[in-house]
Amino acid sequence: MATLEEEFTLSTGVLGAGPEGFLGVEQTDKADQFLVTDSGRTVVLYKVSDQKPLGSWSVKQGQSITCPAVCNFQTGEYIMVHDHKVLRIWNNDDVNVDKVFKATLSAEVHRIHSVQRTEPLVLFRGGAARGLEALLVEPQQNIESVIPDEEVIVWSEVFMLFKQPVLIFITENHGHYYAYVRLCKSHSLSKYTLLLEKEEKSVKPNFTARVDGKFISLVSLSSDGCIYETLIPIYSSDTEQNQRLVRALMLKSVVSGGVRNGVALTILDQDHIAVLGPPLSASKECLSIWNIKFQTLQTSKELPQGTSGQLWYHGEVLFMLHGKSLTVIPYKCEESSLAGALGKLKHTQESGTHSVPHFVNWETCSGYELGSSGAEQSRTLRRKKVETNLQPEVPGFKQLLSIIKKDSEKHIEVELRKFLAKSTPAFHTIIGDLVAGLVGRCKAEPSFYPRNCLTQLIQTHVLSYSLCPDLMEIALEHTDVQMLQLCLQQFPDIPESTTCACLKLFLSVGDDCLRDSNINMESVFDYSDSTQDEKKEMEEQIEIVQNGFGPEDGNCSEDSQQLNDKPADTAHEPGSFPVTSCPVAPKRAALLNAVLHSAYSEPFLLPHLKDIPAKHVTLFLQYLYFLYLKCTGSATMTLPGVNPPTVSQIMDWICLLLDANFTVLLMIPEAKRLLLILYNFVKSQISIYSELNKIAVSFRELQRLNREKSSRGLYSIEVLELF
C-alpha cells in the first residue's frame, strides 16, 4: 500500500513562479536540503524539516536563469546557467552571484544533470554532452550538434549504470518524437523513433523513466489519459540505425482525457507511480499514487487551488506548485504484494467502525446466492476469529520496538523470548526491523551489545545480510567470533569484503578470546585420534610424494634435495612443514571452516585476500594443507564431522591464497617449504593424470578392437554347400 502524509508549504516570498511554474527542484549533498529555481532570476536553498530557506541567490536585472540550479555532489558547490550560455558556480558562503565563478560557453545549454558518484553532466541544445570538469578546462571549446536543427529537446534524464552515467533525452519534430541514449564513457549514441498515436501529436506527452535491467523503461502520460511504457535498449547493436520502438499500455484512464495543462507523472519505485492531474470522475486536480503491478489506485489527494503541472520527487518527498505555494507531501510506498493490493494484509480495526470491503464478493454478484445465511454467518464468525487472533501481534511488535530503544539488555532478552514464543513471526521484515532496532542502539550506545538477543533473531533462519548489513559490522567491532560464525553459517549473501574481514579476525584473535567463546564445533573432528602410523606416513611424504611418484619422477630432484637437506632441527621450527598435527586450536579451526563454506566470487574476493598479513596467510595455508592431508588419507576423500570442508573447497582456497599472495609468500622463509611441497605435489598430480589418460586411451582402444572382433564374427557368412 501507498500513503500520502500531511502536506506543508514552503515560504516562496523571494521566488517568482511564472505561468509555467518553477524551473526545477533539485537535491543537494545534504539529505534534507533542496535547491528551488524559479522561472526568473532566483535560486533558493530550502531545509525541508525546518520549512524555511537557508539562503537565496539572484542574477542581475535583465538576466534570467535558463535551467535549474543543481548541486555538484563531489564538491558541494552549486551550478546554474543564465542567459543560456553563462555558467555560474558558487557555494553557501557566497552572497552575490555576480561575483562568483563565471564561464561563458560556446553553445546554448539545455540542462545540467547531477547525480551522485559522478561529476555533473552538461547537456547542450544540440544534443552534445560534456562533463563539467572537461568543460571548465576550455569553456569556449567547439560543441558539436548531434541532432537535426528541426528537433528540440523536450525532456532528459541521467542514470548511473555500473558506475557509468547513461544519458537519455527525448526530442520533438513536428509531432514526431525521438529518443537518444548516450553512454558517456564510451561516447556511443543511439537514436530511436517513438511510435506515438496520432491524437497525441497535438499535445506534448509527459515523460519519466527508470532503468530496468538492460533497458530504460520510458513511461509517458498521453493525451487520452492513459500511461504507456516503451522499453529502450541501453546497448544498441547498431548505433547508426534509427530503430522504431512500439509502446505498450501500462495504466488505462488514470486522468481525464484531453487535458492540456496541469498533468505530470513520476516513477516512485518499481511498483508505484505518482500522477498529477484531474481524475475521470472529477474536474479538480488530484495527486494520486498507482500500483503498476496490480493496476490499482493506492491513494489520492485533492488539490483545489490547482497546480502548474509539475511534479518532482526526491527520496520519500513529493514537491509541486499548489496555487502559489511550493507544497511538500511526504509519502510512503510499501513493498508491492497481492495481499496488499487486495487489502488482505493483517491490520487492526477499531471497535465501532465499519470497514468497506476491498474486493468483490463473487458469491453475491449478479443476483446469485451460492451460499445460505447459515454458511455466511459461519464465514463471518470464522473471519472474526482469525482477526482476533492476529490483532495482538502488531501491538506486541510495536511495544517490543519501544522496549528495545530504552530498556536494559536483560529485559529486552526476556520480552524478545516471549514475543518469539507467542507469535513466531514468519515475516522477514519483522525480524529485520527488530535487528535494525538493536543494531541502531548499539551504534548510538557503544556499551550496549545484546549478544543473546541478536543470536535468538539470527536463529530464526529468516535473516540475510541484505536485511541487516550493519549486524556483522557491529560484531566485528566487538570481536564477537561466535556471532560472526553464526552469520557465516546462516547468511547466503555476505559480501566478499565482509567474509575477508571475518577471516582476518579469526586468524588474529587471541587464544584467550577463543577460550571464552561458545563456538559451534560440529565441523571439527577430534585431532587427538591420529596414530603414530599416520604421523609416520605423513613424515614419509616428504621423500615419497603421494600417488606413488617420487621427486625424481617429476624432474624435481633439485628442489626436493634442498628440501630434504634441511637440518633436522628445522622440521621442528614454528611454521615448518610437513604438518603432523593441526596448526590451529579446534575453536579457531571451527571458525575457519565457516569461512571455507561461505559463498564468494573469485574476482571480488582476491583483492581483499591481498590485505591479509603474511603470517596469517601462512597459518591459514598450514591449516588447509593439514586438512588436505587428512582428506587424502581417507578412502572416501572426506573429513569426519558434521558438514566438514570438502576437498574442492580446500583446494580452491589454497589456489586463492596463492594467487593473491604468491609474491609475498616467496619472501617468507616459513612458507618456502610449503611452496616446494605444493610444487612437487602438483607435478606428481600432472604425472599421475597423464598416466591415467594413457591407460584410459589404451582401454578405449581395447574396447574398439573387441567391438570389431565381435562385429566380424556376427556378420561372417560360411558357405557349406554349392549346388
UniProtKB/Swiss-Prot annotation:
Annotated stretches, region: Disordered: 549-572
One GO biological process term: maturation of SSU-rRNA
List of residues that carry N6-methyllysine: K346
Annotated keywords: Activator, Methylation, Nucleus, Ribosome biogenesis, rRNA processing, Transcription, Transcription regulation
Localization (cell): Nucleus, Nucleolus
InterPro entries: NOL11 (IPR042859), Nol11_C (IPR048897), NOL11_N (IPR012584)
Pfam families, per the entry: Nol11_C, NOL11_N
Cellular component, GO, one term: nucleolus
Oligomeric form and interacting partners: Interacts with UTP4. Interacts with FBL/fibrillarin in a transcription-dependent manner. May associate with the proposed t-UTP subcomplex of the SSU processome containing at least UTP4, WDR43, HEATR1, UTP15, WDR75.
Function: Ribosome biogenesis factor. May be required for both optimal rDNA transcription and small subunit (SSU) pre-rRNA processing at sites A', A0, 1 and 2b.
Family matches, as PANTHER family: NUCLEOLAR PROTEIN 11 (PTHR15633:SF2)
UniProt-recorded name of the protein: Nucleolar protein 11
